[in-house]
Amino acid sequence: MRRVSGILAVAAFTISAFAGVIQPVAKDARDSAELDVKLTQVDGTVIKAVVTNNGDKDLNILNLNFFRDTAPVKKVSIYSQGVEVPFGGIRVRHKTSDLSSDVITYLAPGESFEDEFDVAITSDLSQGGPVVLQTQGYVPTTDTGGKTLSGVVRYKSNKLEIDVDGTTAAKSFAAMNQFVKIAKLSSCEGSQGDDTRRALRDCASLSTLAAAQAWAGGPKMLEYFKANDDATRKLVADRFTAVALESSNLTGGSTTYYCRDPYNICTNNIIAYTIPAENLISNCPIYYTEFDNVNRKCHGQDRVTTSLHEFTHASSVFSPGTKDIAYGYNACILLSTRDALNNADTFALFAQSINAGC
């Protein structure tokens, strides 16, 4: 049953980072990666990543949903006996323009930066034993001004096997669970509640249109999902239909939607986030202050498609939930069909293109 305790509760969906996801490479990817990621064990489940620019060009790397992000985002994939361990952290939607300088790292050719993180905080490793860590994918880069996403570079790591002490790892994961459970609830009253309800109603309408567009097929399916066959059109339409049904129901379902951040995760670059393991979505302050309800500019961000983006992450909406494999139009259109079907921003951009008439 959906919780409605001083918050706006919205419908649930069935679904399952850019960083940390082991995915098939994009259709035009090269075997070599511009960024080399060297993973080593520091102590227990604490891992060090050294990220090196292997290319011949200066890069401005976005750290959100990547190494150096201080939020509990996915940085590596973890495998136990060949099966990926479920991710228990957060997935965020960040801005694609007007980014602050503190989330950008400049790397000249040959230069590196480091990041240390505890993989047991965001994955339940209480079973202990050997696990394998690895990561590859695409990370956004910004223009020379460092404020707007302008491209992507590929990154790839080594495989690192570590032996996990299950008892110690369980304590780290419990800290994340406690973080979720003790947070103070925020209300959905006043103008923020009104703005959120309007966005959710419009999200339902737009998702219905997007489902119809997907069923019909055509150039837009090829543009965003690189396929136009019956099976792909059905998968896309079914996810949009699930989002439409759930976002139109403000009093039932299993996903809880917060108008205000209950966990102090938001920053001036994050629009909203989802904790898939909790089927919980929260807007951030800039959802209201920096974005309109609908953006008519092609590939733009707005409240409606931000909520849609987050809904596709929720594991109770449409199974499996989407991940954050790529952000922004330029990156999303590079993805293979398999990756696009598993990428939240691809669905958001597909739907937004309908509103914008792209």
From Swiss-Prot:
Disulfide cross-links: C188-C259, C266-C284
Signal peptide range: 1-19
A molecular function (GO) term: metal ion binding
CDD domains in UniProt: M35_deuterolysin_like
Subcellular location: Secreted
Pfam families given in the database record: Peptidase_M35 (PF02102)
Cofactor list: Zn(2+)
Enzyme class, spelled out: hydrolase
One of the record's GO cellular component terms: extracellular region
Annotated catalysed reactions: Preferential cleavage of bonds with hydrophobic residues in P1'. Also 3-Asn-|-Gln-4 and 8-Gly-|-Ser-9 bonds in insulin B chain
InterPro entries: Fungal_M35_metalloproteases, Lys_MEP, MetalloPept_cat_dom_sf, Peptidase_M35
Cofactor binding mode and count: Binds 1 zinc ion per subunit.
PROSITE patterns to which the protein is assigned, alphabetical: ZINC_PROTEASE (PS00142)
Active site: E310
Keywords, in A-Z order: Cleavage on pair of basic residues, Disulfide bond, Glycoprotein, Hydrolase, Metal-binding, Metalloprotease, Protease, Secreted, Signal, Zinc, Zymogen
Stated role: Secreted metalloproteinase that allows assimilation of proteinaceous substrates. Shows high activities on basic nuclear substrates such as histone and protamine.
Annotated family: Belongs to the peptidase M35 family.
Protein's name in the database: Neutral protease 2 homolog PADG_00776
Organism: Paracoccidioides brasiliensis (strain Pb18)
